[in-house]
Amino acid sequence: MGFNVIRLLRGSAVAVVLAPTVLLTMLSSAERGCPKGCRCEGKMVYCESQKLQEIPSSISAGCLGLSLRYNSLQKLKYNQFKGLNQLTWLYLDHNHISNIDENAFNGIRRLKELILSSNRISYFLNNTFRPVTNLRNLDLSYNQLHSLGSEQFRGLRKLLSLHLRSNSLRTIPVRIFQDCRNLELLDLGYNRIRSLARNVFAGMIRLKELHLEHNQFSKLNLALFPRLVSLQNLYMQWNKISVIGQTMSWTWSSLQRLDLSGNEIEAFSGPSVFQCVPNLQRLNLDSNKLTFIGQEILDSWISLNDISLAGNIWECSRNICSLVNWLRSFKGLRENTIICASPKELQGVNVIDAVKNYSICGKSTTTERFDLARALPKPTFKPKLPRPKHESKPPLPPTVGATEPSPETDVDTEHISFHKIIAGSVALFLSVLVILLVMYVSWKRYPASMKQLQQRSLMRRHRKKKRQSLKQMTPGTQEFYVDYKPTNTETSEMLLNGTGPCTYSKSGSRECEIPLSMNVSTFLAYDQPTISYCGVHHELLSHKSFETNAQEDTMESHLETELDLSTITSAGRISDHKPQLA
């Protein structure tokens, strides 16, 4: 009994002693599993954008993925990743790596994805990738590679995609990809490659996509690719290719897309260029220097469902007719911006419209071009006159170099004029609608001002009606009026003698001026006779005739003149007696 108790005490004592050691070991392993400044998600370690110049040494041995992107690493040392046996992917892009040791990737045989893009690597040793034979994806793009070793990718038999984009490669060694039998994507775009050897792609029996765009190829020979029996997409846009040829009789049945846009292709070397690609579905020939395409080439495009031909220098002559006829019968996708570049009269006109409107493909004998002056469409404003019916005559022989305009042009002009009429009527309707809307809004927002406008308009109408009624009431006969303007001599004689000669003018106008009734002040301070309007311009009343008004006015004027003369004579006598009294 006592021995059992002692044993239990001893066991508990051992446990108490070992517990701190176990805890310290666990803490140290935890600290080693996630380095300082990094982010750990399970067995994935992300040490990104930390300006690291060295790879942390405290990374857990069970790490499956390590990302060291956007740091300042400059080189990879010998056995740099020793101890990371479980690592399956490694991201080292966007660093300053310029030197990689030949044995830097020792000990990570399970690695499947290696990203070294956007660094400063200028070369690789032949044995650099030998320890990572299980690679599936290798990205070496955006570096400064000038050349590749002949055994650079030896042993990478499981590689599926290889990216060498945006480097400075000028040549590709022969059979460099011979061990890459499972490679499906090869990207050699944006380099300085001028030519390729025939055995460059030897062994690549499963390649499906090949990028050779933005290089310096001057010609393309489809005989370079007979070993690429599984290739489906070939990208060779934006090179300097001017000629496409085929020097080998073989059938490339796997190719489905060919991109040759942005080159300098002027013509095809022979009618059998595209006969070796019977299953071609998508062809890009835009932005080249093609002027026409022969009927033999068009006949070889038997399986196309998408074509791009814009941006070429198409010559709209009879040579273009075969292409236009083919485009009209083509049922796939195509661009409608196929524009004429010559002759000068048709620059900027759509090729199909030019052939349709100007009868380029009409019957002609010797010349190919058409006479533009005879082929111009008729103006829309010219009226159509009925054609007289003549007796049937034998047809005249066609003139050389001229074609009769097609009747389709008249139909087009009729459609254009009809559309203009519709557009004008719609514009007129919209303008009227806007005016009504403005009036309605102003009526709702400013009702007082609208009422004032209505009252003013009613007053104007009332005045207008009143004037018309007065005009109807005035007599139509013309009356004569006397205009009397006395002179200075006549005035003095009238003052002294009481009578004197006078002159007056007789006129037949309704608007006249007569002198006012004269009094003493008028004669004493006389500069110009004061005038007033006659009574003709007063409104005529229906119960009072004009003659009575005139008689009353004359009687009043006579009375006023008699009074004035009496006052003048009395004033003269008083002035005569004054000197005598003096």
Swiss-Prot record:
UniProt topological domain (Cytoplasmic) ranges: 442-582
SMART domains reported in the protein's UniProt record: LRR_SD22 (SM00365), LRR_TYP (SM00369), LRRNT (SM00013)
Tissue: Expressed in neuronal tissues.
Domain LRRNT residue range list: 31-61
Gene Ontology terms describing biological process: positive regulation of amyloid-beta formation; positive regulation of synapse assembly; regulation of presynapse assembly
GO cellular component: glutamatergic synapse; membrane; postsynaptic density membrane
Disulfide bonds: none
Residues annotated as transmembrane: 421-441
Extracellular-facing ranges: 31-420
Keywords: Cell membrane, Glycoprotein, Leucine-rich repeat, Membrane, Postsynaptic cell membrane, Repeat, Signal, Synapse, Transmembrane, Transmembrane helix
Localization: Cell membrane; Postsynaptic cell membrane
Pfam short name (any one): LRR_8
UniProt-listed InterPro entries: Leu-rich_rpt, Leu-rich_rpt_typical-subtyp, LRR_dom_sf, LRR_TM_domain-containing, LRRNT
Residue spans of the LRR repeats: 63-83, 86-107, 110-131, 134-155, 158-179, 182-203, 206-226, 230-251, 254-275, 279-300
Segments of this protein annotated with the region Disordered: 378-410
Domain (LRRCT): residue spans on this chain: 312-363
Signal peptide stretch: 1-30
Residues of this chain annotated as glycosylated in UniProt: N126, N357
Family, similarity comment: Belongs to the LRRTM family.
Function: May play a role in the development and maintenance of the vertebrate nervous system. Exhibits a limited synaptogenic activity in vitro, restricted to excitatory presynaptic differentiation.
Annotated protein name in UniProt: Leucine-rich repeat transmembrane neuronal protein 3
Record organism: Mus musculus (Mouse)
Lineage, broadest ranks: Eukaryota, Metazoa, Chordata, Craniata, Vertebrata
